[in-house]
Regions:
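Short, polar loop motifs at secondary-structure junctions
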Residues: 32-37, 77-80, 153-161
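Hydrophobic anchor at the start of a short beta-strand
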Residues: 46, 93, 149
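Short, hydrophobic beta-strand segments that form beta-sheet elements in well-ordered domains
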Residues: 26-30, 72-74, 146-154
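Short loop/helix-cap segments at secondary-structure boundaries that form the rim of catalytic
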Residues: 39-42, 85-88, 159-167, 221-230, ...
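Conserved PLP-binding active-site segment in aminotransferase class I/II-type PLP enzymes
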Residues: 1-68
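Conserved core segment of the aminotransferase class I/II
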Residues: 180-236
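Active-site phosphate-binding strand-loop segment of PLP-dependent enzymes
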Residues: 102-197, 206-207
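Conserved PLP-anchoring active-site segment centered on the Schiff-base-forming lysine
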Residues: 61-115
Length: 236
C-alpha cells in the first residue's frame, strides 16, 4: 500500500485468483466480506457499493418515506462524506456532541432530539465500540421517540460485541479503510425493516475507473523505472 496516494494492485495475483475461482458462489465463500458485528444474523440484506458514501446514500434513500420532514441527528466529529451523502439524499440534519475520549455525549444527544428528529446516526471510533451505557441509552432514546438508528462501522469493521454493536436499523461502512483495494463500501438493513426498494446504480464513474487503472499500473512502474510513465502520469 502507498500511504497518502493510490493503492497498489498486484495484477498477477488478481489473474491467478480469477483462474482458481470457478464460480460466483465459490468466490463469495472464499473472499466474501463477513459482517463481523452481526453476531446473531440480523442482517440478511447486504449490498456492496463502490464506497461508504454510496452505502449511506442507499440507506438514507431506503428510509426516505419514513424520514419525510424529519432530520438525522449526527455526531459533531465525522467524515464530510456523511454530509455529502445526506445532501445527495436531500435529508436535513442536526448535531450532537462527541466527548474528547470519542464517546457520545448522551446528554447532548438527548437535548438535541426534537419532534423533528427521525434518526440517530452514530459512529464507533478507531475500532472501539461505544460503551454499553451509551449504546443502551441510544436504544432507549430510539424506542421512546420512535427513531431509526444508523450505525457507522467504518472504523470498527472487524470489531465484535453483540451488546454494543450490530443493533442499528442500518449498518454502513467503508471497506477500503481496511482492505488493500481502491474503494468499497457496505450497507446492511436489519431484518424485517420496511423501506423503499431501490435499483442499484452504476457503481463506478470515470474517476473511480481511473483510480483502479492507476492502482493496477503502479506496481509495474515501481518495478520498471525505465518504462514510459506518460500514460500513468496523464491519468494521475
Amino acid at each position: 500500500m502507498f500511504i497518502g496516494g493510490f493503492y497498489s494492485l498486484d495484477i498477477e495475483t488478481m489473474l491467478k485468483t480469477q483462474q482458481t475461482v470457478e464460480n460466483a458462489d465459490e468466490c463469495k465463500e472464499k473472499y466474501g466480506f463477513r459482517l463481523m458485528c452481526d453476531v446473531e444474523n440480523n442482517y440478511n440484506q447486504k449490498i456492496y457499493t463502490n464506497n461508504g458514501r454510496t452505502a449511506s446514500v442507499y440507506a438514507f434513500n431506503h428510509c426516505r418515506e419514513k424520514m419525510k420532514g424529519k432530520k438525522v441527528l449526527l455526531p459533531d466529529y465525522l467524515c464530510l462524506s456523511v454530509i455529502s451523502a445526506l445532501k445527495a439524499a436531500e435529508a436535513e440534519y442536526d448535531f450532537y456532541h462527541i466527548n474528547k475520549d470519542l464517546t457520545i455525549d448522551i446528554d447532548s444527544m438527548e437535548k438535541a432530539i426534537t419532534q423533528d428528529t427521525g434518526m440517530i446516526y452514530f459512529i464507533h471510533y478507531f475500532s472501539v465500540p461505544q460503551p454499553k451505557a451509551v449504546t443502551d441509552k441510544i436504544k432507549v432514546l430510539a424506542k421512546t421517540h420512535s427513531l431509526l438508528i444508523m450505525e457507522d462501522i467504518t472504523q470498527a469493521l472487524f470489531s465484535r460485541d453483540k451488546e454494543r454493536m450490530g443493533f442499528g436499523d442500518y449498518i454502513v461502512g467503508s471497506t477500503r479503510k481496511w482492505y488493500p483495494m481502491t474503494d468499497g463500501g457496505i450497507v446492511a438493513v436489519r431484518n424485517g425493516l420496511d423501506g423503499k426498494s431501490l435499483p442499484l446504480m452504476q457503481p463506478y464513474d470515470e474517476s473511480v475507473y481511473k483510480e483502479l487503472l492507476i492502482s493496477s499500473l503502479r506496481t509495474y512502474y515501481d518495478t520498471h523505472p525505465d518504462a514510459m510513465k506518460q500514460l500513468y502520469l496523464d491519468r494521475s
